[in-house]
Amino acid sequence: KLKEYDYIFYCDVDMRFVNYIGDEIFGDGLTATQHPMYAFKRPLWMPFDPNPESEAYIKQPGTLIESEGKPLFMPLYFAGGFQGGKTEKYLEAAKIISKMIDKDLSKNYIARWNDESHWNKYLMDNPPARVLTPSFVYPDSLIEEYYKPIWGCNYPPKIVTLTKKFTTRILSAQEQATLRGMSDLTKL
């Protein structure tokens, strides 16, 4: 039934649409959204899966791609909360990512950020045709003093990510490093 549609998009359940969304989401292939926490960050600081045994593992990120005729340096770290694209391309991605996740599960492993990690791995090998700004996964807990220096501008919210209880506490640098799989900050 899904194959009858020109485009398919996925959106997390904890999102609120707050602004008009037009044809800027449509491209010739996949559409991915820059993760607001990692927009304009260096690859070292992006939470790619560090386990070489995982299907989501990304060893040496860094590739120049073209999206909508504009050069982009990959990696960008993409949010899993809003994604999609041309039906054929997106269903193919979903099928492959499902197999990647199943393979990891057969080894009793869950990628660092679950399906989002696999989405990022897939996009490293199959770059998106359309890259959306963090406006499409805009945190409701936005702290302008934090995001403005990262983004260099203010993206107007289109889809707002609702804060989950476990994300309301800001983690210390050591806690963040531990979550990224680095128990010792001196290794940075």
Region roles according to the model:
Residues 1-42:
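GT-A fold catalytic core of metal-dependent nucleotide-sugar glycosyltransferases
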Residues 4, 30-39, 54-55, 99, ...:
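Short, surface-exposed linear patches
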Residues 10, 14, 45-51, 71-75, ...:
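Low-complexity, flexible helical/coil segments
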Residues 19-23, 43-45, 92-98:
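A short secondary-structure junction signal
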Residues 27-63:
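Short beta-strand-to-loop element that shapes/binds the nucleotide-sugar donor at the catalytic cleft/hinge
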Residues 61-169:
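Catalytic core and acceptor-binding pocket of nucleotide-sugar-dependent glycosyltransferases
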Residues 151, 163-188:
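Long, low-complexity C-terminal extensions of enzymes
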